[in-house]
Regions:
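Positively charged, solvent-exposed patches that mediate nucleic-acid binding
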Residues: 1-120
Length: 120
């Protein structure tokens, strides 16, 4: 079954109650300047949230980081074998400019590690 490489509303995690639950009960992992909180989901498919705090730079910088993260999620979400609620966030400004290759590689590595962890 081929999964469409889009980022529709169905895969977005946007209810504050659900996001709070992920932050309270989820597992934390650091991907360099990107933080991730995740937990197994009761939903059929994985859902994602992207958040960048104001401390992470100017509005254009924050928007670029969000755009890069959403694009990486869109391209790589088909790698996930199980349903998760995942929150990606950036709390502080990166020490170096993030490029699309770096973000894509980190998201791919995270999804592969998540699959290994859940299959054990």
């Amino acid at each position: 079954m081929s999964m469409r490489r889009t980022f529709p509303k169905a895969v977005r995690l946007h209810h504050s109650r659900t996001i709070r639950e992920v932050f309270e009960k989820g597992v934390y992992l650091s991907l360099g300047p990107i933080g991730v909180k995740y937990k197994m989901a009761e939903a059929e498919s994985s859902r994602f949230s992207v958040s960048v705090k104001k401390k992470a730079g100017s509005a254009t910088c924050r928007n670029r980081i969000k755009r890069l993260l959403r694009e990486a999620i869109r391209q790589e979400r088909s790698l996930l074998n199980y349903a998760y609620d995942i929150c990606f966030f950036v709390a502080s400004p990166p020490k170096y400019p993030l490029d699309s290759f770096y973000v894509l590689r980190q998201v791919r590595r995270f999804f592969n590690n998540l699959n290994k962890e859940s299959s054990e």
